[in-house]
Amino acid sequence: MKKYLAFAVTLLGMGKVIACTTLFVGNQASADGSFIIARNEDGSANNAKHKVIHPVAFHQQGEYKAHRNNFSWPLPETAMRYTAIHDFDTNDNAMGEAGFNSAGVGMSATETIYNGRAALAADPYVTKTGITEDAIESVILPVAQSARQGAKLLGDIIEQKGAGEGFGVAFIDSKEIWYLETGSGHQWLAVRLPADSYFVSANQGRLRHYDPNDNANYMASPTLVSFAKKQGLYDPARGEFDFHQAYSQDNKNDTTYNYPRVWTLQHQFNPHLDTVVSPGETFPVFLTPITKISVAAVKNALRNHYQGTSHDPYASHNPQEPWRPISVFRTQESHILQVRPKLPQAIGNVEYIAYGMPSLSVYLPYYQGMRHYQPGDDKGPIGRATTLPTGHSARCKRWLCRTTMRLRQMCNTPAKHLNSKQLSSSIRWSRAI
C-alpha cells in the first residue's frame, strides 16, 4: 500500500468520535477450534495505553469508584488476578478495555452503540452514576467465574445502577462467548454466540431475536419486552419482538458510518451474501463462514480499510469519503482474545495486542501464564502523536509502535510528498528507540 503519510492527515480530519469495530468467532467457525473475541479501540491517537497485570487481592473493603463519573460498586472481599489495557491517565484503575482473569474468563469492553431516542426518552442513561466503559472491566473481571456469569453480573448492575451510556460487551471462556447490549438506561439483552458462527458489530446495536424461554442462549432484564410494549416501542400485532427495532438507533449516519464495516467483513467471510449498503438494510446477526476463520484472518479484518476499492480513503487521499474504515489512525489499540480449550490455560489463553492503527502496527502475543510484562508495557504519559517522548516514556510499547508506524509511513511515501520538517521528525523518532 502506498502513501501512508496521508493516513494521519486523512483520519485526523474525520473527527474524534469514540468508536470501535468488533468481531467474534465461535469455536466451530474458527480454523483451530478456538473461541475468539476481537475489537479495535478507536478514540484518540494521543492516548497511551498501559498493559497491566493486577495481582490477586484479599480482604478488600469499601467501594470501587469510577474515574470519569460517580459510579461506585462494592469491592469483592477477594479479587482474582486479571489483566487490563488501561488509559494512561487512570492510575491503571479504569478504562481496562480487555483482559483475562485467573479463572480463564476474558472480556472486551466496550463497543460503543447508540440506543433509540424513544427508548431513551422513556428510560434515559444514568450519566452521573451509571456504569460506563470506564468501570466495566475493573468491576466484572476480578470476580467473573465464567463468561455467562460476567454477562449476568453486568446486567444486574445495569438494572440496579443504570447504564451511563450505550455499549456492547463481550465475554469469553473455554466453553462459550456471550455478548451483552444495552437497550436503554436499565434494559439489556445478552446472547450466546452460536458455536458455528461469527458476529460483527460496528457502533450500532445488532442483536434482534430474544426467546425468554431459552435460558441457555439468552439473558435479559426482566421487563425487557413488557417495558417495550408499555412505552410503544413494540407492538405484538406487528410480529415477533425485535430488540434492535425496539431499542436501537438506525439513522442516516449508520448507513455510511456503520453499515459498510459490517457489510465488508460479512462479505469477506461470506462473499455470496445478498446484502447491500443501503438505508434500512438488515444484515444477518450471526453467520457461518464459508471458510473457517483463523487468528490471521481476524487480524486482516481489523486492518481493513476497503483496500482495492474506490472507498479506500487512504489510497484516494479523500478525507470526505463517506464510508468509515475499520482501521483508522486514531485507533488506540487493537486486541484479539483467543481461547484454545484443548491447551493448558496458561498458554491456551492469548491476548494479541497491536498499539495504534492496526494497518501499521504489529500484534504482540501476551500469554495468560506470563508472570510479568516488560517495563515498557505499563509506561506512556500524555502527549501528542507528533511529540518526541523522552526518558522512560521513549521506551513505552505505545511509543515504540507509534514510531514503527511513522517509519512505515516514511518508507511507503514517495520523497516528493515529504518536507524537511517531516523527514527530520521521523529521523528523531527513529533515534529515540
Curated annotation (Swiss-Prot):
Keyword presence, Protease: yes
The keyword Hydrolase is annotated on this UniProt entry: yes
GO biological process assignments: proteolysis
EC number(s) recorded for this UniProt protein: 3.4.13.19
Record field: catalytic activity: an L-aminoacyl-L-amino acid + H2O = 2 an L-alpha-amino acid
Assigned keywords, A-Z: Dipeptidase, Hydrolase, Protease
Domain of life: Bacteria
MF terms (GO), sorted A to Z: cysteine-type exopeptidase activity; dipeptidase activity
Signal peptide: none
Catalytic residues identified in the record: 20
Protein family membership: Belongs to the peptidase C69 family.
PANTHER family: LD30995P, SECERNIN
Name of the protein described by the UniProt record: Probable dipeptidase
Source organism: Salmonella dublin
